[in-house]
């Protein structure tokens, strides 16, 4: 694509169409943009547009498109072509910093993100001058530019907060500190001076406080891994100024908005985080500054209002106290009874109250409320912070804290009892306080795993929770109902089974509540209860115990999907999946009705897939429906195909990328259930599955390979007879997969199925080429994974076609190659093979080579006979060799960049491990003994003499054991 006006005009038109809400306009535009993004100059055209277009919407759209392009394509993946040409890479890096700094803020943010994505790959080795270029801009005095630099630095360095320690990381941070720490400190001091100079200029202060917030975030990132010497030497400068900013109260920066945090709150929040970091990790060095920070933060907490805009500040301030009170160093600051009472009264209880803003979120923004309350993304909420502070205080003062809080709980419950209609929020706070007081350790899987023994959870459940669960009006006091459900959910491991069984039918009735939060919690609680393990590794709650409620449970779950706000509720769909899995054959009578509802839902969500978890559980539920029903009656598979194929066809025709991996897995499951030949409906689809475009997407590869394996297993002969022209396409897929380090094992899965299931004559003409491709890959890139797969394939070939055929095909490629493969690959590497089936294939294949290949007895290959036998006995008896060569780096298959749908394995579409040898060989050791006996009978004296001269004593002893077990001997 040339950098010319015509191309800029075309790109502008398609970007505009890509914003169109009408999918018939938008989708083709997106497809066009996708099709041209591989062209050289495409990213430069986008940069030109975002710099020069007269239309601001197009500029922003170009910036977002550019950032997403970089996200998808910048990383260079081994075995794959470079998606951004080298000239484009050079031009982008040469211009992007300047462009970012001269752009308006909306565009600046997108380009800043793009720089950090590029930096993640290229900095520092391939972009050594990035930091220097950025630091020099600090001298510009223009805070629009300075803030652009700070924002970019923040997005570049914030990964230091969660990266694992490594020498590479240390050297990068050291380079950053050497270049950046001093200019950042100078900028910090200069900005604070400017704040004093412009103390009455609100516009100047807004810009300066934005800078201070970014500087404080950078301080956090650069200090997270370890305390750098530079910051230790300059601690006085940083901490004195942080303390000054924490106590600053500039009326000009106060906002009228009750929701949105202002600049002052954001800055103080970050400073609280910075102080907490030092208090936790560098307490010795921080000790001189700690008392004044504790005082400042305490004063901040008792003087800050309940408005939402202060939530982040208050939660970070409380988190600071929580991190301090957990450290033995600072225990003395909290041990006084009056201090504990004061903390409880002035900090914890006020911040556990259910405010009108929380009530609004509960009613009007339920998705966000659930995300925060259930999924632990409440990290910056007041309640979560107050809860953490309670836990922190209980570490050293469990008795006194429990006593103080119990008094508050009792008084709150007494207030509620006086007038439940008016005072229900008191009970809500009491439940939350009990929960935070009782919870010592919690996991997503088991709920509370360790509880405060001073709190009687069962008694509280009976006296205060059960009444809300039993209430006939599920729509009355929805917050308290949600609290009660959550109590059951998080204390499920502490409550006795009879209480949980009592709760189950009550939870089922709450699935019909109008409140989204309430019916979502009910679904989630049921799903969690159904996953609890009982004494014999079975489920705690059994299908028999669920029998009286099965119909109502299924009805209410599916009805709740029709409630406003829950059409794609992932918790409900997960509960449906778990219910199917728990009840098994008990759901069969209901499946004919439910499958219609599930397929209808699938059709709806496929129009615009937006809830990945919901979609995943939906497909899992479909798989369970198929497996459970067809287990009892395999013939019913056709009724599922009738229900599902029309929807699947639409998904395939519309290329709904997110759903293709799922569709292929469900189709595999259906096809694998067929007992005889392959149905014609599947054969019609077969050619389409070989289209190269499908194989370009990483997420499609594992499920497509499995589907092709199912085709080969059920219809190898049919393919050979009626679709022989498609065999080259099938082998083309194998060739593509085998060339990739990430996917070569998938190529072998496919190849093994071809060898096992295709009629031998149908692939005779291709066999030699297959081996040549494998040798080329061995020469260019020999990895442990490849060798293990290669060994399994070679031995499967020996099992399927015989040892003579194996020897002949090797030697037809190059004379004496069979010996080279035995000596260089099979003998030294076979011990690396893992997996029972894989080991069995190798054992049977090698046994055939040892006993059914005349060349092993009468040619120069004879010298390899005993080492090969020794290697086979090693495969049987020695531990698996799991060493990996020093020079082989780990290939991270999962971490594929960009917007490709990652492969989502469906747990309930699980494929049984296939044993191509099956019952033909029960015990490979016995087979070896019998085969050696047969060989020795054919050439008496040879085998014992070969064994006695060169097999080591230990291996010989093992072999004697095999012969005895098989009741045979060598002659």
Curated annotation (Swiss-Prot):
Superkingdom classification of source: Eukaryota
Nucleus among keywords: yes
One Gene Ontology term, aspect cellular component: cytosol
Domain annotation Importin N-terminal: ranges: 29-102
UniProtKB keywords: Cytoplasm, Nucleus, Protein transport, Transport
InterPro entries in UniProt: ARM-like, ARM-type_fold, Importin-beta_N, XPO2_C, XPO2_central
Subcellular location: Cytoplasm; Nucleus
GO biological process, alphabetically ordered: protein export from nucleus; protein import into nucleus
Role played: Export receptor for importin alpha. Mediates importin-alpha re-export from the nucleus to the cytoplasm after import substrates have been released into the nucleoplasm. Negatively regulates fluid secretion and plays a role in fluid homeostasis by down-regulating cftr activity.
Protein name: Exportin-2
Organism of derivation: Pagrus major
Gene field: cse1l
């Amino acid at each position: 694509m040339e950098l010319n006006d015509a191309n800029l005009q075309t790109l502008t038109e398609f970007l505009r169409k890509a914003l169109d809400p009408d999918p018939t306009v938008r989708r083709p535009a997106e497809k066009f943009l996708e099709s041209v993004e591989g062209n050289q100059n495409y990213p430069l055209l986008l940069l030109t547009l975002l710099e020069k277009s007269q239309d601001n919407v197009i500029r922003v759209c170009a910036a977002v498109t550019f950032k997403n392009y970089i996200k998808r394509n910048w990383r260079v993946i081994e075995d794959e072509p470079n998606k951004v040409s080298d000239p484009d890479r050079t031009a982008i890096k040469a211009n992007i910093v300047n462009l970012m700094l001269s752009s308006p803020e909306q565009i600046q943010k997108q380009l800043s993100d793009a720089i950090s994505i590029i930096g993640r790959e290229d900095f520092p080795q391939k972009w050594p001058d990035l930091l220097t270029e950025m630091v020099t801009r600090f001298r510009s005095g223009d805070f629009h530019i300075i803030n652009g630099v700070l924002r970019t630095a923040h997005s570049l360095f914030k990964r230091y907060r969660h990266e694992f320690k490594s020498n590479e990381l240390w050297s990068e941070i050291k380079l950053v500190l050497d270049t950046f720490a001093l200019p950042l400190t100078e900028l910090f001091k200069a900005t604070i001076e400017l704040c004093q100079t412009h103390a009455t200029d609100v516009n100047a202060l807004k810009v300066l406080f934005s800078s201070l917030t970014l500087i404080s975030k950078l301080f956090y990132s650069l200090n997270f891994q370890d305390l750098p010497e530079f910051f230790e030497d300059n601690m006085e400068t940083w901490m004195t100024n942080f303390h000054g900013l924490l106590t600053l109260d500039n009326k000009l920066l106060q906002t009228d908005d009750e929701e949105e945090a202002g600049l002052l709150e954001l800055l103080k929040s970050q400073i609280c985080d910075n102080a907490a970091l030092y208090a936790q990790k560098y307490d010795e060095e921080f000790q001189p500054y700690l008392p004044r920070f504790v005082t400042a933060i305490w004063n901040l907490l008792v003087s800050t209002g309940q408005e939402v805009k202060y939530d982040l500040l208050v939660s970070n301030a409380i988190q600071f106290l929580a991190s301090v009170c957990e450290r033995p160093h600072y225990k003395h600051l909290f041990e006084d009874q009056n201090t504990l009472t004061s903390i409880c009264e002035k900090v914890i209880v006020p911040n556990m109250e259910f405010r009108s803003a929380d009530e609004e979120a509960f009613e009007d923004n339920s998705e966000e409320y659930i995300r925060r309350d259930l999924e632990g993304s409440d990290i910056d909420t007041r309640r979560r912070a107050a809860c953490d502070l309670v836990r922190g205080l209980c570490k050293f003062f469990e008795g006194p804290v429990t006593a103080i809080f119990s008094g508050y709980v009792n008084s709150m419950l007494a207030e509620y009892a006086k007038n439940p209609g008016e005072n229900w929020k008191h009970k809500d706070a009491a439940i939350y306080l009990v929960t935070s007081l009782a919870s010592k350790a919690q996991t997503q899987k088991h709920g509370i795993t360790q509880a405060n023994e001073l709190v009687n959870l069962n008694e509280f459940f009976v006296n205060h929770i059960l009444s809300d669960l039993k209430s006939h009006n599920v729509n009355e006091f929805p917050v308290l109902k949600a609290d009660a459900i959550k109590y059951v959910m998080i204390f499920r491991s502490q409550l006795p089974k009879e209480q949980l069984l009592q709760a189950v039918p009550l939870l089922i009735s709450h699935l019909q509540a109008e409140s989204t939060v309430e019916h979502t919690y009910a679904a989630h609680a049921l799903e969690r209860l159904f996953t609890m393990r009982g004494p014999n590794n079975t489920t705690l709650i059994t299908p028999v115990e669920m029998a009286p409620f099965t119909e109502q449970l299924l009805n209410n779950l599916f009805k709740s999907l029709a409630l406003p706000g829950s059409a794609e509720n992932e918790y409900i769909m997960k509960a449906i999946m778990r219910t199917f899995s728990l009840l098994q054959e008990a759901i069969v009578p209901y499946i004919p009705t439910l499958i219609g509802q599930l397929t209808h839902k699938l059709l709806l969500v496929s129009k615009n897939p937006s809830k990945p978890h919901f979609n995943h559980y939906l497909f899992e539920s479909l798989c369970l429906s198929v497996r459970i029903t067809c287990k009892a009656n395999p013939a019913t598979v056709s009724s599922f195909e009738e229900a599902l194929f029309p929807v699947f066809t639409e998904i395939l025709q519309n290329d709904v990328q997110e759903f293709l991996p799922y569709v292929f897995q469900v189709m595999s499951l259906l096809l694998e259930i067929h007992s005889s030949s392959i149905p014609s409906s599947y054969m019609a689809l077969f050619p389409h599955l070989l289209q190269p475009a499908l194989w370009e997407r990483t997420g499609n590869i594992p499920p497509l390979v499995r589907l092709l394996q199912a085709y080969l297993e059920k219809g190898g002969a049919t393919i050979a007879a009626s679709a022989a022209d498609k065999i080259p396409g099938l082998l083309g897929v194998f060739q593509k997969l085998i060339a990739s380090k990430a996917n070569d094992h998938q190529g072998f899965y496919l190849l093994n199925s071809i060898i096992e299931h295709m009629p031998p004559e149908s692939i005779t003409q291709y066999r030699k080429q297959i081996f040549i491709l494998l040798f080329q890959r061995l020469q260019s890139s020999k990895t442990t994974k490849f060798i293990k797969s290669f060994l399994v394939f070679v031995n499967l070939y020996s099992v399927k076609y015989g040892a003579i055929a194996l020897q002949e095909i090797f030697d037809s490629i190059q004379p004496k190659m069979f010996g080279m493969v035995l000596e260089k690959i099979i003998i030294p590497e076979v011990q690396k093979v893992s997996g029972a089936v894989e080991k069995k294939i190798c054992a049977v294949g090698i046994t055939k080579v040892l006993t059914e290949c005349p060349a092993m007895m009468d040619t120069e290959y004879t010298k390899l006979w005993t080492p090969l036998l020794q290697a086979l006995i090693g495969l049987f008896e020695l531990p698996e060799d799991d060493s990996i060569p020093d020079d082989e780096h780990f290939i991270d298959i999962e971490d594929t960049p960009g917007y490709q749908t990652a492969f989502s394995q469906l747990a309930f579409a699980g494929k049984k491990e296939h044993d191509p040898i099956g019952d033909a060989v029960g015990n490979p050791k016995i087979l070896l003994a019998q085969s050696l006996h047969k060989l020795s009978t054919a050439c008496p004296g040879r085998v014992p003499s070969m064994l006695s001269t060169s097999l080591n004593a230990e291996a010989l002893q093992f072999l004697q054991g095999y012969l005895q077990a098989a009741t045979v001997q060598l002659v």
